[in-house]
A protein has these predicted regions:
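Phosphate-rich cofactor/ligand-interacting catalytic cores and adjacent structured alpha/beta frameworks
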Residues: 1-75, 79-80, 117-175
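Long, hydrophobic/aromatic-enriched structural stretches that serve as scaffold segments
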Residues: 64-115
Length: 175
């Protein structure tokens, strides 16, 4: 167990690098244009409650948590631990944006990929999606989705699988 032996500084530095790269991806996403209806550095799209500045503040606020998720992956953490870190990240995001959800989905999906990248540093094999599916897929589906979330509403209304099923299956749309 990793709490009995401290992790080498090189692994801690790599986890921080993973978190930094993930946060940079979030900033680059908001700087991508055109994307009709979505927030960019050019306009707010169809949104009145968020802008590029709120996305940048959010990305900066959640960066340390993305690094912690990578570190948790290195340490072989279970889904409940990843979920707890994700909820802390969500709180930081909401504080940074005045209560606006800019990156809840990214905290979930990209956070899992950060954890998988960490697990690969300790020898997990396969794509990041393979690692997510193998290490946490069952646990992702083992808890009920929030019925008031967008994904929960879509699942009820359309029978769509949503982000949780996509993640649990190893992100087959990506891989």
């Amino acid at each position: 167990m990793s709490f009995l032996r401290p992790l080498p500084q090189a692994l801690r530095a790599e986890a921080a690098r993973i978190g930094g790269l993930a946060a940079r991806c979030l900033v680059l996403e908001v700087e991508t244009w055109p994307k009709p209806g979505l927030v960019s550095h050019v306009d707010n799209g169809s949104h009145t409650d968020m802008d590029a500045g709120s996305f940048r503040r959010s990305a900066a606020a959640i960066e340390p948590f993305l690094a912690r998720l990578a570190l948790a992956g290195i340490e072989g953490a279970s889904m409940p631990r990843l979920r707890a870190i994700g909820l802390e990240a969500e709180g930081a995001m909401l504080r940074a944006t005045g209560g606006v959800n800019t990156h809840r989905g990214a905290i979930f999906g990209l956070g899992l990929l950060c954890a998988a990248a960490g697990a690969r540093l300790k020898g997990a094999q396969g794509t990041l999606g393979d690692v997510v599916e193998r290490l946490w897929g069952g646990e992702i589906l083992g808890t009920p989705s929030a019925p008031d979330s967008h994904g929960g509403c879509a699942a009820l209304r359309y029978g769509a699988g949503g982000a949780r099923q996509e993640a649990a299956a190893g992100f087959p749309t990506l891989y």
